[in-house]
Amino acid sequence: MSINTLKNKKQINRLFKKGKTSIFFPLMFYCIESKEPKVLFSISKKKIAKAVERNKLKRQLKAIYVEDFSWNLNKHLAIVYLANYVCDAIELKEAMQKIKDTYEKD
């Protein structure tokens, strides 16, 4: 399964301004209804300085998303990494599971 990524600047701005926000450390989620599901992964250079570490985290987040987020229908989703350190995959998966449980209730 491939990931349909969110790239349109207007859609990204709308998501961050009007989207529903949830924080499950080390991740922050923005979610808004849309016609087709798209996802955005964001990790700040200020928090994780080394590109190798940022890319590894993004790969881990994408793998978890593909594995567990088949429920994400008709929503744009932004996943923002908040921690100042590199988390392990288990911690990321737990945060993603919490957000999945939260949005399945809606």
Role assignments for model-derived ranges:
Residues 1-106:
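Positively charged, solvent-exposed patches that mediate nucleic-acid binding
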